[in-house]
Amino acid sequence: MEKNVTPMMRQYLDIKKKYKDAIIFFRVGNFYEMFFDDAIEASKLLNLTLTKRENVPMCGVPYHTSKEYIRKLILFDKKVAICEQAANSTSVGPLEREVVEVITPGVIVDEDFLNDDVNNYLVAISDYKNYYSFSYIDLSTSSLGIMFYENSFFEKLKRDLEKYSPKEIIVSENFYYEYSEKLNLNRFLINRVPAWHLDKDVAIKTIKEHFNILGLSSLGFDEEKPYYISIFLIINHIKNNLKNLLSNIDKIDINNDSLYMFLDDVTQVNLELVKNNNDFSSQYSLYSVLNDCKTAMGKRLLREFILNPILNIPEINTRLDHVEFFCKNISLTMTLREAFVNIWDVERIISRIQMKRYIKKDFLFIEKSLSVFFLVKKLFDKHNFDYWNFDKFEEDSISKVYFLINSAISSSSDELIKRGYDLKLDSLKDLKINANKYIDEYLESERLLSKINNLKIRKTNNRGLFFEVTKSNYAQVPPHFMESQTLNSSKRYKTEKLISLEANINNAEDSVVAFEQEIFDEIASNVVKHNKVLKKVAEFFAYIDLVVNFGYLAKKNEYKRPILTCSKEIFLEKSRHPVVEHYVKNTEIFTENFVKINKEKYFCLITGPNMAGKSTYLRQVALITLMAHIGSFVPASRAVIGITDKIFCRIGASDNLAKGESTFLVEMNETANILRNATEKSLIIMDEVGRGTSTNDGLAIAYSIIEYILEYIKARSLFATHFHELSAINHKAFINLSMKIEKQGNELVFLREVEEKPSLNSYGIYVARIAGLPLRVVDRANVILKSLGSRKDSSCLEFLPCISSDTCDREVLKNDTDVHVKLNEYLELKKFISNIDINNITPFQSIELLNQLVLKVISQSS
């Protein structure tokens, strides 16, 4: 096949060999063409018509609409290599072409491909010589950071994969083969690099060159401890695939785990912090409830806060002070929220400008945003709000950027640079716009000078502009006219000024475009000089938007300021679940509950039926604890919360078919992780541990877990269970809680209110009935339950034959009552029949009883 290909196709095949894992967008004129397997795959994903030329499958998309097709491929986790043709190629043969960019899900900077409120991370994981590290980069926001895993490598890595949800991961081949299955890495787009590629000396050289430093110590690294290999993997990957896309990265954030609350991957999922567990969108998550931010930067910071609760009480209180200020000054809060609508994504715009990916509107958006910045300063001064971390030099720098853009960039759709900014550009624009006017003015001046009234200026493609003089006026031709052509009835002349005017007019259009772009690029360069202070402005906007948002929500939702302490306590009065309350507020009133945990009484066992609110109560405590640690007010009338180093949440049942793990094995793995890693300062939330196995095994395991937590870990714990036997545990730190139930006739009302006593019944059959199980099944379950209650000492094996024997009450099974008959009506009928003493009634009484029975049956079936 390759022997008979055209020169252009040979060029394509050579390029494809270098980018085997990417779909090549091969520029041909005004189209991007795809060939061979790329064309087959792209045609299916993009719904394009697949054609053939000389047996080569091909499809294409127009250049001017290519962005939307690229975006769709990125959403399918595909890599796209953009291969452009040279603009002014002089070589013989096909036009010169080269790949100018490889767009992948992890290195997107185009705003059309990004979600405003979510960071777009590329991650690299390194295990070089057992120095484990995790590096992440979001090119769109200039964020580059690293975590050192000095211990608990596996648990922390799982946590961070969930937290950062990377679009793309770089790992060594050895790491991939060892951990791919354990970490389920194939859910991500993976870039595997050969093990020999991880070289310490090459890594040091690459990092030093990028940051223009003499040694890695200036970045916070010890060169003898090569955690920085993961940073090298990121830098090298981007340099090999993209051009000018690292110029915005000028620092590395080295994350300190000890500053933040530990939330493992299971807890992040079970608490539905930033996405729900149904469709994985943000709806019904804590983030969705707390997110009423007005800026994209504020929304992203909120996600970061939720996933990284802090442990420093003074820092938390500073945030709470700011939230309280805006909660109390609601008029200012509403003014700011209205103004924040005009703040654009400065963080991403500055990154694009640094990477030379800017367009005109980026600068106009910065100008609008900075005008809000000055307004915020005035409002803060007026209301004596003391959060202002800009000095005079920085304020002057911000003003320079604002006035530069304001004076230079035009908001008019048909103009880039404003008139008056550059005199030379203005003259070129005038010449371009008024060319005919200048020609007419010059013609009129020569008519007056020569007295030739019918003097004309004409133009041909070959000769350009010239004066035309008829025979009768030859004697009046001025001496500075230079004859260029003689015709039968006239002569054509040029002058130095006409030649110059024509040249200026011809060059004006190209000159305007080129010179305007030159000025535009110069303005961009000047703005980039202020990138550090502009990034600081972006951080300021994000934080202020977030605390204003928290203050607004506190006022709107009646949240209260939590008190953070160093004690082992959680005290909540009239607490509510923030998410459930938010989504049911239009249909019902959420039931408030108390929580009382301290160093003496720190383990709560919660019993009660399903649907009574146990799981909601558990999550409620965890979410309120987390909200307090991010600096938010909380849904409670009063909250006192001891600093919590870790939250563990083991709720729900699921299996892991990919790993061949049963529901019970998953449950035990998660429980083992909690028991290994929890400390006395942790909060443990566990729901229905032990239900994935036999009753006796489950009860024994649950009892042993509780005992271990009480005696060895001593963490604040809430443990929901259906094993009522556990309520008999006798320990000084043990508290029995249950969910209140009110019986109204044969109906149960779940009050969803916690009380300090154990529950003696799960009411499972009642729940099954209201869930819609066939009445025949429900009735049979009641019979079996009663039989079980009378045979407490019998084993299950002894009992099963018994309930299937002739002595068992088979009336329920024979009963062909319609499934819609209510259970209480059936029980009433059964009670009526059971009370008949057939040995002591007269024939007349029996007829009367039979008549009553018929009437009851008729009334119940009607």
UniProtKB/Swiss-Prot annotation:
ATP binds at residues 608-615. Keywords: ATP-binding, DNA damage, DNA repair, DNA-binding, Nucleotide-binding. Gene3D superfamilies: 1.10.1420.10, DNA repair protein MutS, domain I, MutS, connector domain, P-loop containing nucleotide triphosphate hydrolases. SUPFAM superfamilies: DNA repair protein MutS, domain I (SSF55271), DNA repair protein MutS, domain II (SSF53150), DNA repair protein MutS, domain III (SSF48334), P-loop containing nucleoside triphosphate hydrolases (SSF52540). One of its GO terms (biological process) is mismatch repair. GO terms for molecular function: ATP binding; ATP-dependent DNA damage sensor activity; damaged DNA binding; mismatched DNA binding. SMART domains: MUTSac, MUTSd. InterPro entries: DNA_mismatch_repair_MutS, DNA_mismatch_repair_MutS-lik_N, DNA_mismatch_repair_MutS/MSH, DNA_mismatch_repair_MutS_C, DNA_mismatch_repair_MutS_clamp, DNA_mismatch_repair_MutS_core, DNA_mismatch_repair_MutS_N, DNA_mismatch_repair_MutS_sf. Belongs to the DNA mismatch repair MutS family. This protein is involved in the repair of mismatches in DNA. It is possible that it carries out the mismatch recognition step. This protein has a weak ATPase activity. PANTHER family: DNA MISMATCH REPAIR PROTEIN MSH1, MITOCHONDRIAL, DNA MISMATCH REPAIR PROTEIN MUTS FAMILY MEMBER. This is DNA mismatch repair protein MutS. It comes from Borreliella afzelii (strain PKo). The gene is mutS.
